[in-house]
């Protein structure tokens, strides 16, 4: 799978401008066929979900870029992870609904968005060419997706591949992504206490990390959008550590989850039809997921003529976000007086 990562690295420039993969400026995305979300039956059964108010310490943010005309901004800060010991860059964006009075005491669902290639020193999902924040504001306003808090950390500590894992003798990037980054979110934003409010999205190497995070810790994370992923660990840093490598292999984790019978997780895969990864990812889906039956639920959005690029995946992002939104907890408005 390493050639996929190399190709992605060639395509991704410093700020996520994928000019080498074709196109400039914002991609044209048609979400007209994405329906509105259904009412969440779980809300009526379980009542008001438990909101977790910001725990602190609050981060000091700077504005990375302003998004659209709704007053929202992508913010940037650094966060020191207690679990990993790593200090890294994080970008964050809250949807317009977060500041609306009716949601002032409500939690919001969180989407941890991971880039492809090295995912260092930047995270391209924070940048204007993809306009993920502007699109999510539009889609959630239309009722097609939930209004997620977007959190966009660096994926790796340098220009090397750590497979989103705690590789012995290396920076603990698995702990960074699954413990420290959620701690950052809980320190600064209103969230939910249950896994119904937590999901990942990632592409290529970030897709591997997103897939693995949900399969490894399904009690904490419910869903992932997995774009053109690697489906097996392949960092050269695993050499000499076969047991730890196996413990971070999505195939092994999927088998374990199926054997346990749950908890149920939801994986939305995106693939460009021209990707080299198509056969491998389809084998993973057919071999380790059970479609609608679970405990590993899956769906696949295959993009005609699509290649291994964020410009491909953004085209079906509304569909993927809609699909996982149907399984997750949205904000709850205060009762009308």
Role assignments for model-derived ranges:
Residues 2-12, 16-337:
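Non-catalytic cap/lid and distal C-terminal segments of serine-dependent acyl enzymes
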């Amino acid at each position: 799978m390493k050639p996929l990562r190399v190709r992605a690295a060639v395509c991704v420039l410093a700020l996520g401008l994928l000019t080498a993969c074709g196109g400039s400026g914002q991609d044209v995305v048609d979400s007209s066929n994405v329906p509105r979300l259904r009412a969440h039956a779980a809300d009526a059964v379980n009542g008001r979900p438990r909101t977790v108010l910001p725990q602190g310490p609050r981060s000091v943010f700077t504005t990375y870029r302003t998004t659209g005309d709704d007053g929202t901004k992508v913010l940037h800060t650094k966060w020191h992870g207690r679990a990993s010991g790593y200090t890294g860059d994080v970008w964050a964006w809250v949807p317009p609904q977060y500041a609306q009075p009716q949601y002032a005491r409500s939690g919001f669902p969180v989407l941890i968005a991971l880039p492809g290639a090295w995912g260092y020193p930047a995270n391209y999902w924070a940048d204007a060419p993809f306009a993920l924040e502007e699109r999510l504001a539009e889609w959630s306003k239309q009722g097609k997706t939930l209004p997620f808090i977007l959190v966009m950390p660096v994926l790796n500590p340098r220009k090397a591949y750590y497979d989103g894992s705690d590789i012995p003798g290396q920076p603990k990037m698995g702990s960074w992504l699954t413990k420290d980054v959620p701690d950052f979110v809980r320190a600064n934003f209103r969230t939910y206490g249950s896994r119904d409010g937590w999901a990942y999205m990632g592409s290529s190497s970030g897709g591997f990390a997103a897939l693995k995070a949900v399969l490894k810790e399904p009690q904490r994370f419910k869903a992932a959008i997995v774009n053109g992923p690697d489906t097996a660990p392949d960092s050269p840093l695993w050499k000499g550590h076969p047991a730890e490598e196996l413990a971070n292999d999505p195939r092994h984790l999927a088998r374990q989850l199926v054997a346990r019978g749950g908890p149920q997780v939801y994986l939305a895969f995106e693939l460009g039809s021209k990707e080299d990864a198509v056969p491998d990812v389809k084998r993973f889906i057919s071999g380790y997921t059970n479609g609608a039956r679970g405990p590993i639920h899956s769906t696949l959005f295959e993009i005609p003529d699509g290649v291994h690029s964020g410009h491909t995946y953004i085209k079906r992002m509304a569909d993927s976000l809609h699909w996982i939104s149907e399984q997750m907890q949205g904000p709850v408005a205060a009762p009308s007086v």
